[in-house]
């Protein structure tokens, strides 16, 4: 009898595929098509990280909250989902819908029900790496939840934030450096506590986090929003099409992030593979290819991408229509915003909409001027340091890009020491200034020592600006 029912289910599926119709199969057929992975003793784990703070970075926490709702609806247990977010957005005075976070113009609230595992200053590098390793004793604060996985388990890590060559932002100092992250992933593999691990990364220059650093053979498959040399993009921003509701003055999401999340919501994760999603997300994130867009990349064990998404994200029974899809039905935006300019978009729209003569307009004007002044200070300081160190060759040395497949820098300790030397004299690099991490890495690759950097930074920066963006109150970024 079972064989007959199974054959009938298969027959109906093939008829639907040929005719183009969508057939909702009965639960017994669903069981027939369910991958064998669901029948083993494996457990799904997830780590979701929003690595920023500030209302102008609304989109990162919106991405992560939306990802949580997707996994929860997919049946991933709450106790197995670890969430890192500063949690300063939902109840922020700038939020036009207090207590609510949306990730798309017509989206539902994605904030309600999201666990507050690690918030505020608990969102830091040490806690994140301890969570991935399952090391409860190394935690400081938070819920104490870690990835306590076993050898048959599957892990999904999603990180949304600002980035720069070789570095990922954190709302607390220091930032997360590529070598430290990859070292922890290697330790996790050596511990024998997972069967496969998938890492989705949203950040500028995110390809540099894994390029030349993540080897094959660790059963890790990673995709990134951009290659090692380009920005990633915010989306659903004011002035775009589609645009957020009129009361919002900030971007609601990030292009790569909403691409994979919205794809997951519209397709059957029991049949869609990691590779199929990669191709769809790559197409949507590429945008126009001229005015905007980035190159989604993949690293590690590419063969792992043949696995079904259900293995890592679960599946929502409402989406189990078993329709194979090779076209992304979601319309790409007409225009998007460079990740590094999203804060300026917020400040500018805040200024434009504020009543003339109001305290809000004065505040917004100050925020725009402070942000622009900080950018000029960092850009000019790095350029001048390059000239002081390398003379007329400074610009060429600072902007040199290593061949594909090579890591950003040979000596990561050197990179961190030069970052600290710069910040001691010139102030914080900030979420904007980490775009210059390649320039500092190239100083190391050219043999520059910390003493030389100190001397050059002292000449380039007689004083540290008083701007909040330059403040070192939170400590050094390395």
Curated annotation (Swiss-Prot):
Q: What class of enzyme is it?
A: hydrolase
Stated EC number for the protein is 3.4.22.34
Knockout or disruption consequences: No macroscopic phenotype, probably due to functional redundancy. In plants lacking all vacuolar-processing enzyme isozymes (e.g. alpha, beta, gamma and delta) shift of storage protein accumulation from normally processed polypeptides to a finite number of prominent alternatively processed polypeptides cleaved at sites other than the conserved Asn residues targeted by VPE.
Q: How is it modified after translation?
A: Auto-catalytic activation.
Tell me what turns on expression of this protein. By senescence, wounding, ethylene and salicylic acid (SA).
Q: Which residues are glycosylated?
A: 135, 321
Listed under GO cellular component are:
protein storage vacuole
Tell me a GO biological process for this protein.
vacuolar protein processing
Q: Which Pfam families match?
A: Legum_prodom (PF20985), Peptidase_C13 (PF01650)
According to the UniProt record, which cysteines are disulfide-bonded? Answer: 237-251, 414-444, 426-461
Kindly list the places in or outside the cell where this protein is found, as annotated in its UniProt entry. Answer: Vacuole
Listed GO MF terms: cysteine-type endopeptidase activity
Task: Give me the reactions it catalyses.
Answer: Hydrolysis of proteins and small molecule substrates at -Asn-|-Xaa- bonds
| Tissue expression from the record | Specific to vegetative organs, especially in senescent tissues. Expressed in developing seeds, rosette leaves, cauline leaves and stems. Not expressed in the siliques. Also present at the branching points of the roots and in vascular tissues.
- List the active-site residues: 162, 204 (nucleophile)
Q: Which UniProt keywords apply?
A: Disulfide bond, Glycoprotein, Hydrolase, Protease, Signal, Thiol protease, Vacuole
- Site: Required for post-translational maturation and enzyme activity. Where? 251
**Residues spanning the signal sequence:** 1-20
Cite the PANTHER family for this sequence. HEMOGLOBINASE FAMILY MEMBER, VACUOLAR-PROCESSING ENZYME ALPHA-ISOZYME
Q: What is the documented function of this protein? A: Asparagine-specific endopeptidase involved in the processing of vacuolar seed protein precursors into the mature forms. Probably involved in post-translational proteolysis of seed storage proteins in the protein storage vacuole of developing seeds.
The record's family statement is: Belongs to the peptidase C13 family.
Q: What name does UniProt use for this protein?
A: Vacuolar-processing enzyme alpha-isozyme
Species this chain originates from: Arabidopsis thaliana
């Amino acid at each position: 009898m079972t064989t007959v029912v199974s054959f009938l289910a298969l027959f109906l599926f093939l008829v639907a595929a040929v005719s183009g119709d969508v057939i909702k199969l009965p639960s017994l057929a669903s069981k027939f098509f369910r991958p064998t992975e669901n029948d083993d003793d494996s457990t799904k784990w997830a780590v979701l990280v929003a690595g920023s703070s500030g209302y102008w970075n609304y989109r990162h926490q919106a991405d992560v909250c939306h990802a949580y709702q997707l996994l929860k609806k997919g049946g991933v247990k709450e106790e197995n989902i670890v969430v890192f977010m500063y949690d300063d957005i939902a109840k922020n005075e700038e939020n036009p819908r207090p207590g609510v976070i949306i990730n798309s113009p017509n989206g539902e609230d994605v904030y309600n029900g999201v666990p507050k595992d690690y918030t505020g200053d608990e969102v830091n590098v040490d806690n994140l790496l301890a969570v991935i390793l399952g090391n409860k004793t190394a935690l400081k604060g938070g819920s104490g939840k870690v990835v306590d996985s076993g050898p048959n388990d599957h892990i999904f890590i999603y990180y949304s934030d600002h980035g720069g060559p070789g570095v990922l932002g954190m709302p607390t100092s220091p930032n997360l450096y590529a070598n430290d992250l990859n070292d922890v992933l290697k330790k996790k593999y050596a511990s024998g506590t997972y069967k496969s691990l998938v890492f989705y990364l949203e950040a500028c220059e995110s390809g540099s986090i894994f390029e030349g650093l993540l080897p094959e053979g660790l059963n890790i498959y990673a995709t990134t929003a951009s290659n090692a040399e380009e920005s990633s993009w915010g989306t659903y921003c004011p002035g775009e099409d589609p645009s957020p509701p009129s009361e919002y003055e900030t971007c609601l999401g990030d292009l790569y992030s909403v691409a994979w999340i919205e794809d997951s919501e519209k397709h059957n994760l029991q049949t869609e593979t990691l590779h199929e999603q990669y191709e769809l997300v790559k197409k949507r994130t590429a945008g126009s290819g001229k005015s905007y867009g980035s190159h989604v990349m993949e690293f590690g064990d590419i063969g792992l991408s043949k696995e079904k998404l259900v293995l890592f994200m679960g599946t929502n029974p409402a989406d189990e229509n078993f329709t194979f899809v090779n076209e992304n039905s979601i319309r790409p935006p007409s225009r998007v915003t460079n990740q590094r300019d999203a804060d300026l978009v917020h400040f500018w729209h805040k200024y434009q909409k504020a009543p003339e003569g109001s305290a809000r307009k004065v505040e917004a004007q100050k925020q725009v001027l402070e942000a622009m002044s900080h950018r000029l200070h960092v850009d000019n300081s790095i350029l001048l340091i390059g000239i002081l160190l390398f003379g007329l060759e400074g610009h060429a040395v600072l902007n040199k890009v290593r061949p594909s497949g090579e890591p950003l820098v040979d000596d990561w300790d050197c990179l961190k020491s030069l970052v600290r030397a710069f910040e001691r004299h010139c102030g914080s690099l900030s979420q904007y200034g980490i775009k210059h991490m390649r320039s500092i890495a190239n100083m190391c690759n050219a043999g520059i020592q910390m003493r030389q950097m100190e001397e050059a930074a002292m000449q380039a920066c007689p004083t540290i600006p008083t701007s909040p963006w330059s403040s070192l109150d939170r400590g050094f970024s390395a």
